[in-house]
Amino acid sequence: KLLSEEFQKAMETTHCLTDELNDTSEQTVTKVQTILEKMRKNSYSLETDSGKADMVTGKVVLNMQWSGDGVYTMDEAEKDGLELSYAVPEEGSNLWFDGFCMMKNGISGDAKKKQAAQAFINYISRPDNVIRNMYYVGYTSVIAGGDSDLIFKYADWCYGAEEDEEEVSPYDLSYFFSGAKETPNKYVLEVPKPQASRQVSAQYPEQSVLKRSAVMQCFSEEANRRISRMWIRVRCF
């Protein structure tokens, strides 16, 4: 269905992919359970953390991971001379990001708490601290850097091709970094060809990937219970 011509055209003008991704109806959850039960017979495990090590050691050849964990896995595999790649299903995927926000219930009208929360968010959003966090956790920040090119330069430092690299590909990050309209090509990396399907594609997916991705919404308590029961049935029976 997701790859049908009708659905692909509808994606250009509607939120149909978002609706599909966030469908928690009883009927859909039952269908998902049936698929997962069949998949489980050919699956090494249903667990994310151990999957990273299993990819590096060669126990498994395919692993569904969050993009940052994918970057971590590829980095670790490189140390052993193993080159792994990252891909997003052509049917679509979950579009997500890490960020900080102030909870109304946490602030509760307290001016000092609000000031402290704002100070922390301002501090953690500084480009230099954004880079420190990205280096440590392997996940892309929602911060592009504003007037500062520091974060883009960090991406270039991580993934840009060396001067003597023979086969390179342009990797356009203009959609993410500010100022792209005024300075075309300013935010285009020259990366080694294999890198275009590795870490940089996990950190900064191309626009073609974003167009077939949607944000997962917070499920209701009823939906969470329904999905939790489904997972129990899949894993335990």
Positions of PLM-derived features:
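Ligand-binding pocket segment of bilobal, Venus flytrap-like solute-binding proteins
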Residues: 2-87
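Solvent-exposed, polar/charged alpha-helical surfaces in well-ordered, non-transmembrane soluble domains
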Residues: 34, 53, 57, 115-122, ...
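Mature extracytoplasmic/periplasmic domains
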Residues: 103-203
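Conserved C-terminal helix/tail region of periplasmic/extracytoplasmic solute-binding proteins
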Residues: 178-237
